[in-house]
Amino acid sequence: MTEFKPIKEGKVREIYDNGDSLIMVATDRISAFDVILKNKVTKKGTVLTQMSKFWFDYTRDLLPNHMLSVDVKDMPEFFQQPQFDGNSMMCRKLTMLPIECIVRCYITGSGWASYQKTGKVCGIQLPEGLKESDKLPEPIYTPSTKAEIGDHDENISYEKSIEVLEKQFPGHGEEYATKLRDYTIALYKKCAEYALSRGIIIADTKFEFGLDENGNVVLGDEMLTPDSSRFWPLEGYEPGHSQPSFDKQFVRDWLKANPDSNYDLPQDVIDKTIAKYLEAYELLTGKKL
């Protein structure tokens, strides 16, 4: 059996080169505030992979994505070991674009903090009088740069995203920036409407895109997982304060309340975290993992 070594290790994912494709493995690691925590969250990698698969299938009519298969039988023998089953995705190789495409439709988190000070989120003027967790009149696109592990992503304007892309792809900066913005908002609208019908509010999320061998923009990375999105229960939604969530916010809140934890979570926080991830998956897909 041929051994495979990851060519890249991210905060949560490991990427393996499979010749004309890549194999992306979502581990059970969890990160918060750009730090990888000491604990593993059992089944988390499977939730991330299977939820991405669900959304990639759901949005294929809008634009192509990089997913080829999540069935390990389609992958080399090395990936047919138990630790890869359910949390591995074989993907097309793309030239990734250096922008994190963030879309927000509810005011929360760093956006709420910024709005309280300036009335703006990432430089975008918002209506006066919004309360925490209010729905915005329209989704807003707030791109950021992609940071290396240990660094923080930097929020940038749409105009700045044109510059960043133009530098790397001369003659295509505006074309790619426009496509990223328009695809991001279209994907969000389609998926947020579906999620609402299943009892989940998608407050905000992040997409990443790449180019295929013909220069087409293709959706890559993960899609609408509890790691890349804020999911709130529709039942009990009430603006004016922060909302309960199905995502990492629970971990972030615990870490903020326990600054001396040295990023070491107690077991009950881990158990509650995976329960929230699984509940979100089951609500959205109607399936159990």
List the predicted regions and their residue ranges.
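Active-site loop/lid in soluble adenylation, ligation, and acyl-transfer enzymes
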Residues: 1-148, 261-289
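Surface-exposed helix-capping loop/turn segments at secondary-structure junctions
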Residues: 60-66, 190-202, 215, 285-289
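Coil-to-beta-strand transition motifs
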Residues: 21, 96-98, 198-202, 214-217
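A long amphipathic alpha-helix within ATP-dependent nucleotide-binding catalytic cores
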Residues: 169-203
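Intrinsically disordered, low-complexity acidic/polar segments
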Residues: 33, 112, 214, 228-230
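Conserved metal-phosphate-binding beta-hairpin within the catalytic cores
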Residues: 103, 202-223
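Anionic ligand-binding catalytic core segments
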Residues: 117-120, 125-175, 219, 223-284
